[in-house]
Amino acid sequence: MDTLSNIPVFADAQWCAIATDIAFKVLCSLGAIMLVMCFAGLSVVAERKVCAYIQGRFGPNRTAIPIVAAVPLVGNFLKKNGLMQLVADGLKFLLKEDPLPKHVNKFWYMAAPVIALSPVLIAACVVPFGAYWSDGQLCPLSAADIDVSLVFALAIGSLGVYGALMAGWSSNSKFPYMGAMRASAQVVSYELAMGLSVLPVVMWVARNSDSPLCLFEIARAQQNVWFCLLQPVSAFLFLVALFAETNRLPFDMAESETDLVSGYHTEYGSFKFGLFFVGEYGHMVLGSSLFIVLFLGGWNPLPGVVWPESWGWVGAVMSLLTFIVKIAAMLFFFIWVRWTLPRFRYDQVMRLGWKALVPLALANFVAYLLIMSF
């Protein structure tokens, strides 16, 4: 400390506070990215285990790393629950041959997987994964607390479709191109319904807050009653649109195996295909986080129950754990729906978006507008 105090920059208390704040934000950014990446990886194992349970199978329970498997109790637990399968999948993607077809547009072909994954990691930095008390004020456990974080997360998160679009176009093949067109049309169709579904939430928060578009303010407004109870129609619309935005069954038109082989990533393999895979599950984690903040009370464990200020950093850790449990529950719901419902036809997906969800979202918005006017 004496050495740092001799440096003019750190001798000033103001600069020390700025440096501390920057370091905290960097750590929060890395934490948000690591949280998304870890959940994206674990979702692959969860997908296999839940699928196996639904189909009456055991799922992955044989893969073992020799050194880790030899550890008493821990090794057997990791093996039986298929957690070592995640390492095997990662090594497979890294060590497989990485072909580069001659007929592709090389630059955009290689950039597409990065474009598909990057928006998720950027948008995750504005999500409040918890809260902590500082100088008597409740502060968000996020990398960036901006007044328009809701708009930022929705806008940046939707840019992931450009990765699919670039992959389909640069592959110079009919099936990837058709998958890319489906992905872009689907995002445009359901982004409108998703945006309309959050407007009643914003209007409700605007009554008592100057920053109704801030995710932290939206979550804090649900300390007494969660918005899924106050606005169930909005929650339902957002959830259905979320399935379409993340290309999950029954809305996986962009990579429908029965129609398009593998869709926009048909020409991909090895690590680049793995990035698309992680990007899809990363979008699931981001979408689940937004749904939790908007309708499931954020870091609050139950309606009317909050973590007290006297708990200090213990309360902050508990709020983060609460959020993580809710994300896990949402991911289980995603997987459960995938292995329960059949895939829709493409015309049914478009008809549902434009002829059902958008009119219902408009009617829901007008209804809440009239209710709040009186």
What are these regions (language model features)?
Residues D2-F374:
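Selective transmembrane helix interface/packing segments
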